Structure formats: C-alpha cells, structure tokens
C-alpha cells in the first residue's frame, strides 16, 4: 500500500502529543494561564489527530485489501477487497494534502481579534464615500461569521467618512481579515458627474492584531543588585547599615532604587516593583512602535498604483491583484460575501508555503 511514510510519522507524533495534552489538561485545576496555553495547542492538534485517525484507517484498510487480493479465492470477497483498495488509493492522496496544509506554520496572530482602521486616500469625495461603503461590507461579513464588531471611532465629513476604526472579535478573525490590509481602488461614476465619466479613487485599510497585555518576566541572572547607606537631607547618611537598594536590569539598563523603607528587604521589594513597572512601560512603548510600523507597512501611501483590489462598479467586477482573481459579482461582494476572495488568498498562501518547504 503506497502512502507518504515521512508524513505519516510526522502526523503520528502530533497525534501522540494531542493525547498527552489531553491527559495533562485533566490534571490542572487552578493554573488558568497553563489551561489556556494547552487549549490553544489542543485546538490545532485535535484537528490533526482526527485527520490522522482517518488517514490511518484508510491505510490499514488498503493493506488488508491487498492481502485479501493476494490470498482470497472467493470472488465476492475479492470484489469487495478491490473496492476497498480502490477507495483507499483514491482517499489517501486527498487526506495527505489536507494533512500537509495542517502542518504548515501558521501566523501566531491568526487566532487574535483585530483592530481595523479605514481612511480615504486619493480621489476626494468618492474616496470618503467608499470608506463608508466598504465599512458596511465588513459589518455584513462580521455578522455572517458570527463575529462581533465594536466601533472605536467614526469621523464623518460632508460626504462620507475621513476615518473609521473598529474592533472585530471572534474565532480566528485575523486569519481571514488580515488579507484586507492595503489599498483598495474603486472605479465608478460619481453621483455629481454630469458627463458619465468613471472616476478612480482609493482608500487604505489597516488590519492589526489585537495586542496582548505585556507580561514582564525578569530573569534573576539579568539583575545587578547594589546596596548602600540611605541618605538624609544634605546627603548625610542617616544610618550605619546599607539598607538602600539599587537594582539594575542589565539587558536594558533600566534602574530602580529605593531607600525609604526601614529595612533592606522592604527597599528591595519596593525597588523590584518599580523595576517591573519600568520594564512594562518600556515594553509597551516598543510594542506601540511596532504597532505603528505595521500600520505604515500595510497601507503604504495610498497611491492608486499600490492597490491590492479594484472594485469596478460599471462592470460589476472585483479584481484582487495579488492573485489575479476576477469575479463579476461586485454587488454580492459589497453585501459581505468576501469568502470566495479570502479563501482563494488563503489557498495561494498555503501553496506558496508548501512550495517553499518542499512538501
């Protein structure tokens, strides 16, 4: 029976891990952070384990069928064995392809909620109007996926919107909405156009994964702790013992010191609290900088030439330029039917990943 033995071994390891995770989860009662981590791992490994069970069943059935064909004389049993073998040979390549996709590395942000920011770019009034149009599309798409939308900010202008931001929460939101990031181009005849000329305008869409709260983990080996005598007014040492504490976080150079406590232990505890707060603040600033840089990279300048997708109203046509996909159903897409486009983009991404990994 022919099958991908290397793939089989890799998937079998994941199935074993899935079983181990389930057993581990049963023993944890109060460590909610650990429970959350295990559940995230189980979410993916369970799908793979279930597919592996189906894969193994088809392989085993094929092996048994081959053995029967080589030994069985009863014509009826031979016919049944041949049917089982044909079914296994047809099913195994399909399941193997599904398993390969499941093994592909995933974006660590795929399970996160998203923050979406929409702005008019080139094209004047039509650009502002289309911000509102595409927002309605996203609202309909949110509802169709049983996600939840929360408006963060809406800034209307004379004809449409100069800015809209909102959050979408739900299952695997970023894994699908991330493909909406970029410049969207619209071609249509404005209501104010008396000569029927088609105008071209653009808007920018940034889709950002919701940021997790930054946890500060301090490695004791990264700390340098100095003690010294506490000073009073005028720099005079107010006691003979070195009760003041200065803690330096060596990797970042962040320093926290305390001398107000009555003992070295008290000052050390206070200095550690201060250090954690300072490191948290520094991490937040870095995270915000990365967040801003991600937004800049996604939306570009808003120039028409940077488009990811074109919406042509006169021809009822939508073209996604990243994969050269054209659909003549703009009216349906603007009502929130984005799945055909997004599914095609996901397939393209998976195909490229498999090609790069040589699988």
UniProtKB/Swiss-Prot annotation:
The keyword Cytoplasm applies. PROSITE patterns: RF_PROK_I. Methylated by PrmC. Methylation increases the termination efficiency of RF1. Pfam families: PCRF (PF03462), RF-1 (PF00472). The modification N5-methylglutamine is found at residue 236. One of its GO terms (cellular component) is cytoplasm. Its main location: cytoplasm. Keywords: Cytoplasm, Methylation, Protein biosynthesis. GO terms for molecular function: translation release factor activity, codon specific. InterPro entries: PCRF (IPR005139), Pep_chain_release_fac_I (IPR000352), Pep_chain_release_fac_I_sf (IPR045853), Prokaryotic/Mito_RF (IPR050057), RF-1 (IPR004373). It is found in: Cytoplasm. Peptide chain release factor 1 directs the termination of translation in response to the peptide chain termination codons UAG and UAA. HAMAP family: Rel_fac_1. Belongs to the prokaryotic/mitochondrial release factor family. NCBIfam families: prfA, PRK00591.1. This is Peptide chain release factor 1. It comes from Ureaplasma urealyticum serovar 10 (strain ATCC 33699 / Western).
């Amino acid at each position: 029976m022919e099958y991908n033995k290397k793939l089989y071994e890799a998937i079998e390891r994941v199935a074993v891990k899935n079983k181990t995770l389930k057993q581990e989860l049963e023993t944890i009662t109060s460590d909610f952070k650990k429970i959350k981590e295990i559940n995230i791992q189980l979410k993916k490994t369970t799908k793979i384990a279930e597919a592996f069970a189906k894969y193994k069943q088809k392989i085993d059935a094929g092996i048994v069928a081959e053995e029967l064909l080589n030994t069985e004389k009863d014509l009826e049993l031979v016919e049944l064995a041949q049917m089982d073998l044909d079914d296994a040979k047809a099913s195994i390549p399909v399941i193997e392809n599904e398993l390969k996709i499941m093994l592909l590395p995933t974006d660590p942000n795929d399970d996160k909620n998203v923050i979406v920011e929409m702005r008019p770019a080139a094209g004047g009034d039509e650009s502002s109007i289309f911000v509102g149009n595409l927002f309605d599309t996203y609202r309909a798409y949110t509802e169709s996926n049983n996600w939840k939308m929360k408006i963060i900010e809406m800034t209307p202008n004379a004809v449409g919107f100069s800015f809209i931001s909102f959050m979408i929460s739900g299952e695997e939101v970023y894994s699908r909405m991330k493909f909406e990031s970029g410049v969207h181009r619209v071609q249509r005849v404005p209501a104010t156009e008396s000569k029927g000329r088609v105008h071209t305008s653009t808007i920018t869409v940034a889709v950002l994964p919701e940021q997790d709260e930054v946890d500060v983990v301090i490695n004791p080996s990264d700390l340098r702790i100095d003690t010294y005598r506490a000073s009073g007014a005028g720099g005079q040492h107010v006691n003979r013992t070195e009760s003041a504490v200065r803690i330096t976080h060596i990797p970042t150079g962040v320093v926290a010191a305390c001398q107000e406590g009555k003992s070295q232990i008290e000052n050390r505890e206070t200095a550690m609290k201060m250090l954690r707060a300072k490191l948290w603040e520094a991490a937040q600033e870095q995270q915000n900088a990365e967040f801003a840089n991600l937004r800049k990279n996604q939306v570009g300048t808003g120039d028409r030439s940077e488009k990811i997708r074109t919406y042509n109203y006169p021809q009822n046509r939508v073209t996604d330029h990243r994969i050269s996909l054209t659909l003549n159903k703009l009216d349906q897409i603007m009502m929130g039917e984005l799945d055909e486009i997004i599914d095609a983009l996901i397939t393209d991404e998976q195909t490229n990943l498999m090609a790069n990994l040589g699988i």
